[in-house]
Amino acid sequence: MRDYVKINIASPKQILKWTERLTPKGKYIGKLKNSKKTLDKKGKCIRGGLFCEQIFGPTKKNTCRCGYYKNYKKSKKEKKHIKLCRICNVEITDPIIRNYRMGYIELNIPIINILYLNINPCYLAIITNLKINYLKQLHSGKAYITIKDKNQKEKKLTGGEAINDILSKIDLEKTLIKLTNNIHQYKEKNITIKNFKNILNKIKLYNYLLQTKIKFSWLLFKYLPVLPPNVRPIINMKNNQQISNDLNTLYASIINVNNKIIKLKESLIPDNYFINEKILLQKKVDQLINNEKYKENKLGKIINNKKLKSITENIKGKEGIIRENMLGKTVNFSGRSVIVVEPTLNLNECGLPKEMAINLFYPFIIKELIKLKLIKRLYKIKKITKILDIILENIIKNHYILLNRAPTLHRLNIQAFQPKLTIGKSIKLHPLVCSAFNADFDGDQMGVHIPLSLKAQAEARNILISINNCNSLKNGDPNILPSQDIILGCYFSNIENCNLLYILNKIQIYTNMEKIKMEYKKENLSIHNFIWLNFKNKQQIDKLKIKRKNLIKKIIFLRTTVGRILFNDIIKNFL
């Protein structure tokens, strides 16, 4: 069995299957009619409203709205069947169902889905054979079409009603046959290349609609699904105030306009007199789906001049449900910060900020504090700074961390390091390690991850550690290469500065290298100062010669700089 996801246009019957339920008493529940208040003074949900317990389920576990059943425990026989309260007709079950149970609003007129108009290519324009601008005018109520009633009276239609009338007159199978005949006879009829391409696009779309058994009427809303209440929460404050999600105000405005149209129809007023209400209902549904169009319009704003957040805005973008909560979910025991150079570190070490380390190793710290019986309450942890530092250092000694630089294109973009606590907010790295990461110190960021299981820790210590990844996998070339800063530093320390300040000064004579280092530390000498150094080459081979004359001792002095001596000493210690 292969699992797959199929995305298709939902039919009105399918929407009713999602939102409507049949009770044991034989009544259908799911239709929303009320929009006055979401919660009453007691904090209970109003019947038929956006948070109705009868439609969406109870707010407390095994407790009904009226209080007839409180913490009711079902028997084994009752668990198989739906249990309803006799008085308030609320299902006695777990409130988790409020996370996924939906309702619906029955719209009095067909409403256009704005997403089908804004998409490119516009499928409504291809099906109806009308221009996009004209369809948008019909959608906004600026244009209209005239039809005749049964009594042969002219009637003006706009918005969803007009497009619904145009779509109802199109026969899918007959139009497909006509289009295929036009393609076969394109030479005789002298069809242009543009028209030929348009006909091909229509045939592709019509074939897809026939294969998937989609009807044109499904492109319009008849039943508007309402999201579960826990997705759009509401909170009662102490000062009789309510904090509500933006979607609740949008749903409430749709119900208000829809109820107004129902009352006007019941009062037998002709349809031409409440066209404005129909256009307003279309705008309200558009705001619910996508509110970007109404940025400058007063309809899309609330009292504090803040734009209401629509469904598409909740889904799309970095802060949307899909990227933030489903795909790009932030992982626990991880962090991110800017990298900074630190040449004093070893190749297998990295500098980790103290604040970040406390947050990353927080559970480990609590575990140690509970073992030592030093703390009882969690909020007092940050006050014990001295003990905290000692515990944190003991934890870090035996715990390697993983550093990742995005984009992770190959294996060497993730390597393990032994952390060392540092002051500041940046991660510190040895410059020789950066070539494997393809990182520079110009604002690059790295992610920190902690391996938790014993297998992950062993893999980090043996395989992922930076010392064991010195060569590239593709050709065996060394990854630990001197970067721009190191090459520039080597050049700067070995260069002879021929400035008059250095040349005209008296060149001092030294017989010992340690004296030169001491003078450099005392800042009596700079890197570019010229000096004479007594050079004793121990590996030089001399021939033995016996002469009668007095023996002459040969002393060699080399003119060099302080920087070259220090550089030579570093290489000698390394080798």
Curated annotation (Swiss-Prot):
**Catalyses which reaction?**
RNA(n) + a ribonucleoside 5'-triphosphate = RNA(n+1) + diphosphate
Q: What is its EC number?
A: 2.7.7.6
| Top enzyme class | transferase
Q: Which GO terms describe its molecular function?
A: DNA binding; DNA-directed RNA polymerase activity; metal ion binding
Instruction: List residues binding Zn(2+).
Output: 64, 66, 85, 88
Where primarily located?
plastid
GO biological process per UniProt:
DNA-templated transcription
Q: Which InterPro entries does the record cross-reference, listed alphabetically?
A: DNA-dir_RpoC_beta_prime (IPR045867), RNA_pol_asu (IPR000722), RNA_pol_N (IPR006592), RNA_pol_Rpb1_1 (IPR007080), RNA_pol_Rpb1_3_sf (IPR042102), RNA_pol_Rpb1_clamp_domain (IPR044893)
| Keywords attached to this entry | DNA-directed RNA polymerase, Magnesium, Metal-binding, Nucleotidyltransferase, Plastid, Transcription, Transferase, Zinc
Cofactor entry: Mg(2+); Zn(2+)
Q: Where does Mg(2+) bind?
A: 440, 442, 444
Subcellular localization, per the record? Answer: Plastid
Its annotated function is as follows: DNA-dependent RNA polymerase catalyzes the transcription of DNA into RNA using the four ribonucleoside triphosphates as substrates.
PANTHER family to which the protein is assigned, alphabetical = DNA-DIRECTED RNA POLYMERASE, DNA-DIRECTED RNA POLYMERASE SUBUNIT BETA
Q: How does it assemble?
A: In plastids the minimal PEP RNA polymerase catalytic core is composed of four subunits: alpha, beta, beta', and beta''. When a (nuclear-encoded) sigma factor is associated with the core the holoenzyme is formed, which can initiate transcription.
Q: What's the protein here called?
A: DNA-directed RNA polymerase subunit beta'
Source organism (scientific name): Euglena longa (Euglenophycean alga)
Which gene name belongs to this protein? Answer: rpoC1
